[in-house]
Amino acid sequence: MINESVSKREGFHESISRETSASNALGLYNKFNDERNPRYRTMIAELHEFFHLTLAETITETDVKELECNKEKAAKFRKLMPKMLNNCRELTQRKSYIPYNSEFNGNDEKQKKFQLLHQHQIVLSFQEFCDELAKLIIDAHVLSFLTRCDYSYEIIPKNWTSFYKLFQYVMGAVGPIISYVPVNYPMIRKELGFETLTIFQYYDSKLFECMKSHFGREFSTLVSATIHHYIHMFPITNTMLEKEVPMLRIMSNCNFSIEGLSPKDFYMKTLRQYYCEESNLRPRLETFKNFKVLLTRNALLASLFSPEWVSDANDLFISHLLLNKKSISEYIEIGKDTYDEEKERYFKTETHFSLLMFRNAFEAKNMLSKFKEFCDDAVSEKLKAAYGSNHDTERLFDEVVQLANVDHLKIYSDSIEYHLCNLLGSTSKAIEQYVKYFESHLFIIVRKIKTTKKDLPRDMKIKYLNENLPILRLKFVNLPTFPNFFERSIFRKTILQSDQNSSFIKDILPVYKDSLMELFKQRIITNVSQEDEMRYRDQYQPYLSQFFQPVEVMADLRIKYASFLSFYENIEAAVKFGKTYNENNSKSFFPLIFDRERIPKVFQQSNEVKKNFVLPQEMDDTWNQFLRNYHEQNKVEDSDASKKELYPMWNLHHCEVESPYIIQDGTNLIFELTLFQTCVLTLFNESDHLTLQVISEQTKLAYKDLALVLKSFCNYKILTRDIDNTYSINESFKPDMKKVKNGKLRVVLPRTASLQSSNTGGERTSSAHHEGSNSQWTQELLKACITRSVKSERNGLDYDHLFETVKQQIKGFSVGEFKDALAKLLRDKFITRDESTATYKY
């Protein structure tokens, strides 16, 4: 018998002893009629006392190392263990009887009958007895641990590992006893609950059942707290992996469920909630830059609980940060915000993170189509938001340029171009709006250089200009006709703003060429250095080809850009001539003489236009004086110009007329008019009221031209008209100051009509050009429609279906024009023809 005085905290364990007595009654000797066998009763009591001793010697300990170093206690347990194992053997191998029937003898007394109990039942009952004693030890240790930690979700995780190691020591002390039956009677392991668990895993589950009974519904909160304890622990090291024994790892080993979930599923659920709530794991610049570090840490954290969870945990992390449209959209926004600071092109900003990593993540999950869809949706949403209900093209192109700058590898550039053209109606309209946007920014940058950076050296000014130009990197910049849009704009501005004081002539025109070449060279010369190409070849190989154009396209582009330079030189020469004449001869006249071949076709006239209308006397004298001076000068000098004839382009003549209206700065408002408008308006210097017939007789203008001019003045309320077709100066005229720029108001001819004259001397073309009727313009529209139609069909279109699709979009073209446009697109490799299916594809 073990001396009961061994316990130093007898008072603490009295309740345990009293509870155990009931267990004894259920255990072996009252149940199996062992009252008459004191030997078995003694063995049962000795086992009970051994468990009692184990509890007494360990309940006050908090550091298992002290127990392991206490040789006296270890010797005590070792000394008693052989006897305890012998008791186990005796109690499981004994014979026991139970009454099964009673009979009356002749004296009316009951006679008991007994039946030998099967050993299987004896063994099971002994294991129940051991489980009951083990449960009492577990309950006592759990209660002591939770009491010390004050049931705190913060303190328990910090002390869990030390408690569990103490628990392992205690269960190891009684291990030979509680494992006696499973080890020696393997045939009944299944009935005991040890089919899939080891004996210690079984008692680990009993440990968690006990803790669950203390926390009830809040048990899952405790488990979450232990997970978050490790999540917020920095850094996670291999040493930690060796020393820590997380609660969830033990639960996983013993298949203990939480809220009906397996430990792994519960961990993934907790991790998912953490990702959503943790601000440091939202799409941010630092998060993307440290992506690999965070992913490695995520893997180490999962391996702390189970190495088998690493793959799923990393998939969850990647899914949260990469595999969704929101993250792609946020990454693009981050790129827009940081591009101005980094000022790097293509690969330079890809060292930390890039959209390619998103793409690779989607591709690894066989979700590449989803990636393209998400990119397309993100681009579409951003462009629509920028364009808005008020159709703000300035904001739209701000967004387009920023999106293109982020997309260094041109992963979603096709989406940008598609949605841009879709919002603006067509490719040609998108290019037209971009030209306006480019020129607007060029004006702003030049003005800023003049005001805030005027002291910089010239090369620094040029560098600043080039760095801040809104360069657009989309495929339509490759169109051979792309420079033509700029040519038309430059030509038009040169005509409208040709005077000595014009900011366009003084400041913009001198830098326009270099600025455009900075834009154009993006299509001719790649910014990828050989060093970068070699460095990133493996990772970026699929995209390198996007930076280079086919040889045929390159040759065509160079020809077009050479043609642009020639056009630009002609503009410069014309402006130089006009400046010289303006300074030396007439301050009010600025002549521009162009080579006919260099004038954009939409502005050209087929034949010479004779002056079959009447100019105001002063203007007529100035014009005739110019002709005399020009011919006389060229005749004397025997220049090349003497061999050429002058063809006046009356429809393009531009006049500035000073009005009597005073604006806010105290100066007279200046009207910007066409020559024909000027001829009409100057008549009102002599009379305030003129009839249509009188105006027609004095100007000799054709009725269509005259009607359009008068309508333009009425639209701006400069003139009024009565029921007798009499036109008068509007005495109460007030200009719309929103339309006044630099003290000038341009009176625009109505767009709804065409200025044409059928005078006998020739044909005159209006300055309100309807470019869609021009053959060259029709070609561009056809090419844009063909490209868009083919692009929208994944499987391509055959010739007939393609023709019908384009025919639904634009009208008024011939089959020959359609075939020419199709042939040019095939030549320039904007589309291809699949010979096997006879279809055209993008």
UniProtKB/Swiss-Prot annotation:
InterPro entries assigned: Cullin_homology, Cullin_homology_sf, Cullin_neddylation_domain
UniProt pathway: Protein modification; protein ubiquitination
Free-text disruption phenotype from the record: Delays anaphase progression.
Record cross-link Glycyl lysine isopeptide (Lys-Gly) (interchain with G-Cter in NEDD8), residues: K791
Signal peptide per UniProt: none
Domain of life: Eukaryota
Location in the cell: Cytoplasm; Nucleus
Subunit structure and binding partners: Component of multiple cullin-RING ligases (CRLs) composed of 4 subunits: the RING protein HRT1, the cullin RTT101, a linker protein MMS1, and one of many alternative substrate receptors belonging to a protein family described as DCAF (DDB1- and CUL4-associated factor). Component of a RTT101(MMS1-MMS22) complex with the substrate receptor MMS22. This complex further interacts with RTT107 and CTF4 to form RTT101-MMS1-MMS22-RTT107 and RTT101-MMS1-MMS22-CTF4 complexes respectively. Component of a RTT101(MSS1-CRT10) complex with the substrate receptor CRT10.
Function: Core component of multiple cullin-RING-based E3 ubiquitin-protein ligase complexes (CRLs), which mediate the ubiquitination of target proteins. As a scaffold protein may contribute to catalysis through positioning of the substrate and the ubiquitin-conjugating enzyme. The CRL associates with CDC34 as the E2 ubiquitin-conjugating enzyme. The functional specificity of the CRL depends on the type of the associated substrate receptor protein.
UniProt protein name: Cullin-8
